[in-house]
Amino acid sequence: MIHDERIRSLNTEKPARDGKYVIYWMQASVRAHWNHALEYAIETANSLHKPLIVIFGLTDEFPNANSRHYRFLIEGLRDVGDALMKRGARLVVENERPPSAVMRYSDEASAVVVDRGYLDIQKEWVDELAESLHVPLMQVESNVIVPVETASPKEEYSAGTFRPKITRELERFMVPLKERRLAVDSLDLDPGPDLNDVTGKFRASEELEPSIFSGGASEAIRLFDEFLSEKLACFEKYRNDPVKNCLSNMSPYLHFGHISPLYLAMKASKTGECPEFLEELIVRRELSMNFVHYSDNYSSIRCLPEWAQKTLMEHARDPKEYEYTLREFEEARTHDPYWNAAQKEMVITGKMHGYMRMYWGKKILEWTDHPERAYDIAIYLNDKYEIDGRDPNGFTGVAWCFGKHDRAWAEREIFGKVRYMNDRGLERKFRIGEYVRRVQELEE
């Protein structure tokens, strides 16, 4: 089922009856599996008795993206290209800005369907295309369980204010997505270059070592099945423990749209009680979409609530026992072995344990000469090294370290009223030395 709330008309144009095909502009939901935008595009193509082509614009202009991110993305494109072919739709990848790639094929299109992203650049691309197209542009939301505006009409203060609003919508939106069949396939069309030619020639502006994860829906499904059978039982108890191997590792796949959050939620729910997993997947993740969608400053310290900005600036010049530069942070050259291990884990694997990411961000605030510079450093490092950097979850995670979605605590130096974390807490809660040793083994 595709609820009306997922669908938005972005212009007032009428379908071109003499067009050769319908276009699905795939950008945020790179999958053929449980993808509302794709299924809506198939419905549209069938209603017009047209084939469907799927277009992806592979641009090197995406802010802060590097070879690590593009390698993961391209693996997903190859996976989805094969999956689409089995369903009778051809994937066209053009090495250019996404709206330009779609416009290149729009003269012979009857209609265009696009999925939905929440970052500023994704909104700008869609607005640009909407102003240029002479056929209908429909946007279908598929990367959240509850559509963002349905969950809440405003930016929420915290998980506590957001949770009851999204929870009361879950029963309505937690329904399976039926896979449609294309009436007319596009496999005989030859509208664009070969996928392997385009991806093989693509070069990112910044080279980075690949992460340990491979992209694509097939790999995401395999990892999630492994999580359900081997890790879910310990997730509820040990999800915050960086020593335990209990996480789903779905965040990179959710970021690139290689897996559906609805699919994950419904499959996990069938295995039994998993409230903490659903809390993270639904409440916490979709709170991050709420934040990025409604905030004008989601990548800046100006996104923080007034009390957090005020208290941090009041303590901006407090004396600091340790102070580091961006380069020292990036190279994991601090006095703290736990922080260094977290940074190295991110650099080596492309993913840092969630609990350590909180500690990591708090310490950047504590050891930088000014909170605004600390914020920028945390965003920069997260965006550069995390496979799921440049993502609502990442922006929200950094913001939380500085007071977003949290309350004021007892005032102290440097942090003011922002929540504090220290190494003694790690030592008290976890066998943190084992975490450090495990990261050292990764280095070797």
From Swiss-Prot:
Textual note on the cofactor: Binds 1 FAD. The FAD is in its reduced state.
Known catalytic reactions: cyclobutadipyrimidine (in DNA) = 2 pyrimidine residues (in DNA)
TM stretches of this protein: none
Enzyme Commission no: 4.1.99.3
Gene Ontology BP, a term: photoreactive repair
Domain Photolyase/cryptochrome alpha/beta, residue spans: 20-148
The keyword DNA-binding belongs to this UniProt entry's keyword annotation: yes
Reported cofactor(s): FAD; coenzyme F420-(gamma-Glu)n
Residues the record lists as binding DNA: 239
Pfam families per the UniProt record, alphabetical: DNA_photolyase (PF00875)
Function noted in UniProt: Involved in repair of UV radiation-induced DNA damage. Catalyzes the light-dependent monomerization (300-600 nm) of cyclobutyl pyrimidine dimers (in cis-syn configuration), which are formed between adjacent bases on the same DNA strand upon exposure to ultraviolet radiation.
Protein name: Deoxyribodipyrimidine photo-lyase
